[in-house]
Design a protein with these regions (language model features):
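Functionally constrained cores in energy, signaling, and assembly domains
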Residues: 33, 47, 51, 58, ...
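Second-shell loop/turn segments in exported
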Residues: 51-63, 76-81, 154-155, 176-182
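Long, His/Glu/Asp-enriched segments that create or flank divalent metal/ion-associated functional microenvironments
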Residues: 1-24, 96-202
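Noncatalytic, helix-rich "gating/capping" subdomain that lines the substrate-entry/channel surface
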Residues: 1-64, 68
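Short amphipathic alpha-helical coiled-coil/interface segments
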Residues: 62-77, 91-102
Length: 202
């Protein structure tokens, strides 16, 4: 409904958002537009975000911070007394295969085949087809371990149990979670808690 006329969009909001979820009023159109661009062209927006807001020094600082916390977690596991030896060995093995993903992908989505025009509905169809083709081309191929769960401007962190990856996009690597100019204790207490939380999922 969001790609159709204002009447459809309004009716959709009245029922699905206001009646079913108790949301009193619809967000401004420009904000919904930003959300749509972020959802549809996330990595294109992400490249701009990284260029403007996430310098290489920030990534290097986070790389070191994550490594230190994984090392500390390993030390705790090695000295753990409530696990039996076999369980501890498996936990250490799993920790040794952790893949931290920090800041942004190393393999950006190529949008060059995507045609965007002036019509919202046509653009929605083109984006849906682009996303479908992107998924279909992966059929029968090995899992792409470089693919990220969300674009770098996302304020979130996650653990992927299928790939044993912890992900910290550039969007969360800003105050109050992370500040490259702050005392290390501040970062260990802020983003460090998030990192520890994600490591703990593993």
């Amino acid at each position: 409904a969001q790609y159709l006329s204002a009447e459809f969009d309004s009716a959709n909001f009245e029922f699905f958002s206001k009646t079913l979820r108790g949301i009193p009023e619809q967000r401004e159109r420009w904000k919904r537009g930003i959300n749509q661009i972020d959802a549809s062209l996330g990595e294109a927006v992400g490249q701009i975000y990284v260029d403007r807001h996430f310098p290489p020094a920030n990534k290097a600082a986070m790389d070191a911070l994550v490594k230190n916390l994984i090392d500390a977690f390993r030390e705790r596991l090695e000295n753990n007394e409530w696990m039996d030896a076999a369980t501890r060995e498996q936990a250490l093995l799993k920790l040794s295969t952790f893949e931290p993903k920090i800041g942004y992908t190393t393999k950006w989505t190529d949008y060059s085949s995507l045609e965007i025009g002036e019509d919202l509905f046509d653009n929605a169809l083109a984006l849906a087809e682009f996303g479908w083709r992107d998924q279909v081309k992966e059929l029968g191929k090995p899992v792409d371990r470089e693919k990220w769960p969300y674009p770098p401007q996302t304020v979130n962190a996650s653990y992927n149990p299928l790939l044993n990856q912890i992900t910290f996009p550039a969007g969360i690597l800003q105050p109050p979670f992370f500040d490259p100019n702050a005392d290390p204790a501040v970062n260990y207490g802020a983003i460090g808690a998030v990192i520890g939380h994600e490591i703990g999922h593993g």
